[in-house]
UniProtKB/Swiss-Prot annotation:
GO terms for cellular component: plasma membrane. It is a single-pass membrane protein. The keyword Isomerase does not apply. Component of the Sec protein translocase complex. Heterotrimer consisting of SecY, SecE and SecG subunits. The heterotrimers can form oligomers, although 1 heterotrimer is thought to be able to translocate proteins. Interacts with the ribosome. Interacts with SecDF, and other proteins may be involved. Interacts with SecA. This is Protein translocase subunit SecE.
């Protein structure tokens, strides 16, 4: 065991403050804002977050768009082939 000040075993003097001296904060500026104030805060936070975004360059955007379009076309082809195959199986089984 250590006898260091502020450790779990030996708390320092700041940790022993009486409960009556500690102030509990209720409300404050955040709790007193009306609906329009909260809405304005929401939009300010949106703008702040959008400023943090690292936007892709034009070449990256072209590459990403091409990859998505090719993937969608391949998936459309796969679903079409499966649909035609199932239709033929159902037609064969049920006449």
């Amino acid at each position: 065991m250590t006898d260091a000040v502020g450790s779990i075993d030996m708390p320092d003097a700041e940790d022993e403050a009486p409960e009556s001296k500690k102030k509990s904060r209720k409300g404050g500026k955040r709790g007193k804002k009306g609906p329009l104030g909260r809405l304005a805060l929401f939009y300010r936070q949106i703008v702040a977050e959008l400023r943090k975004v690292v936007w892709p360059t034009r070449s990256q955007l072209t590459t990403y768009t091409s990859v998505v379009i090719v993937f969608v076309v391949v998936m459309i082809g796969l679903v079409t082939v499966l649909d035609i195959g199932f239709a033929r199986v159902v037609k064969y089984v049920f006449g």
